[in-house]
């Protein structure tokens, strides 16, 4: 394996029905989400959610990497959560730092471990997963 292949990390993450993959390598601090620079993502909540692992990691680590995140499926926030998880896992794997793992776990455990909750499916003869027809006694 060459030196360039050793410094290249790929991680995956899922949240609900959204999937994300993160490709990380040494670089100059640029992060792209679906080939769009993270700075120009129009929805601020999504942008800040994806940037959380970078902010927690610090400027020293952030300025020395280049990350490309590709998301598909699900909704906007599901994709943002999956991208955040994939980026956090990639940074931990790339830096091989126990301190970074502890920082992420103390801030939000789902950055590394994930969130297994799924939408409950709709049942037959019901309007939704739990809603039933109102019962009339008179």
Swiss-Prot record:
Under the heading Pfam families, the entry gives: Ribosomal_S9 (PF00380)
**Does Ribosomal protein appear among the keywords?**
yes
Q: What is the lineage of its organism?
A: Archaea, Thermoproteota, Thermoprotei, Sulfolobales, Sulfolobaceae
Q: Which organism is it from?
A: Sulfolobus acidocaldarius (strain ATCC 33909 / DSM 639 / JCM 8929 / NBRC 15157 / NCIMB 11770)
Q: Name one GO cellular component term.
A: cytosolic small ribosomal subunit
Q: What is this protein called?
A: Small ribosomal subunit protein uS9
Give GO MF terms, alphabetically. RNA binding; structural constituent of ribosome
Key word NADP present: no
Lineage: superkingdom: Archaea
SUPFAM superfamilies in UniProt: Ribosomal protein S5 domain 2-like
Which keywords does this Swiss-Prot/TrEMBL entry list?
Ribonucleoprotein, Ribosomal protein
Q: Tell me the gene name.
A: rps9
Q: A GO term (biological process) for this protein?
A: maturation of SSU-rRNA from tricistronic rRNA transcript (SSU-rRNA, 5.8S rRNA, LSU-rRNA)
Q: Which family does it belong to?
A: Belongs to the universal ribosomal protein uS9 family.
């Amino acid at each position: 394996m060459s030196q360039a292949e050793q410094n290249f990390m790929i991680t995956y993450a899922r949240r609900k029905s959204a999937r994300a993959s993160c490709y990380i390598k040494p670089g100059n601090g640029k992060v792209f989400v679906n080939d769009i620079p993270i700075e120009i993502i129009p929805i601020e909540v999504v942008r800040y959610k994806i940037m959380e692992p970078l902010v927690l990691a610090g400027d020293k680590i952030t300025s020395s990497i280049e990350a490309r995140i590709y998301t598909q499926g699900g909704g906007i926030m599901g994709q943002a959560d999956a991208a955040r998880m994939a980026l956090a896992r990639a940074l931990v794997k790339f830096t091989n730092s126990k301190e970074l793992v502890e920082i992420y776990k103390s801030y939000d455990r789902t950055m590394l471990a994930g969130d297994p909750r799924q939408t409950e499916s709709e049942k037959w003869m019901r309007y939704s997963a739990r809603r039933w027809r109102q019962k009339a006694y008179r």
